[in-house]
C-alpha cells in the first residue's frame, strides 16, 4: 500500500484495501460550481485548458477525464490518499505524462525560476509565491479526476466512521 498526505491533512484510519479501492479525504460536493470553474476562480484557467487539451491528445476527445474536469461537481482535494501499490502505479502512469507534457508545452523545463516567471506573466493574482505552484494545483485536480473516474473512494472521517 502507498499513502500520501499533506501537511494539513492526515488519514489516521486505514485498513487492507482491495484493488481499485482508495481511502481519501471526504470529497467536496460543490453545488454551485464545477471543477473547471472552481479552478478558474483561484488559478490560471489556461493551465486547465492546457491540461484538458493534453488529456484529449492522449485519450481522445470526449474522454472520461476531460468530462470530469469540465463538468463534475465532486472534488477529492488535498492529494491525500491510501491505495494499493498497483493502483498507485496506474495513477502515476496517468498523471506524470500529462504533467511532463504541460511542463514542455509551457517551456518550464522543471526549473523553479521558470515557474516563478510563468506565475508573474500570466497570473491575475498578486501572490506569485502561491501561484507558482501551478503544477501542484493541476496535480490535485488530476489526482481527484483519476480517483473519481477509476476507483472506489472511501472517506475515513476522524471518528473512524467511513463515508462512501
Language-model-detected regions and their locations in the chain:
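ER/Golgi luminal nucleotide-sugar-dependent glycosyltransferases, focusing on the catalytic module
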Residues: 1-164
Amino acid at each position: 500500500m502507498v499513502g500520501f498526505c499533506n501537511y494539513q491533512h492526515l488519514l489516521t484510519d486505514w485498513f487492507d484495501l482491495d484493488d481499485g479501492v482508495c481511502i481519501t479525504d471526504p470529497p467536496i460536493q460543490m453545488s454551485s460550481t464545477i471543477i473547471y470553474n472552481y479552478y478558474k476562480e483561484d488559478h490560471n484557467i489556461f493551465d486547465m485548458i492546457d491540461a484538458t487539451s493534453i488529456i484529449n491528445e492522449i485519450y481522445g476527445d470526449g474522454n472520461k477525464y476531460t468530462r470530469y474536469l469540465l463538468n463534475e461537481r465532486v472534488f477529492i482535494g488535498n492529494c491525500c490518499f491510501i491505495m494499493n501499490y498497483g493502483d498507485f502505479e496506474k495513477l502515476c502512469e496517468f498523471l506524470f505524462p500529462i504533467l511532463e507534457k504541460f511542463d514542455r508545452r509551457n517551456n518550464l523545463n522543471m526549473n523553479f525560476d521558470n515557474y516563478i516567471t510563468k506565475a508573474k506573466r500570466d497570473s491575475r493574482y498578486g501572490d506569485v509565491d502561491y501561484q507558482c505552484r501551478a503544477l501542484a494545483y493541476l496535480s490535485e485536480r488530476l489526482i481527484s479526476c483519476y480517483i473519481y473516474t477509476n476507483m472506489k473512494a472511501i472517506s475515513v472521517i476522524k471518528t473512524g466512521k467511513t463515508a462512501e
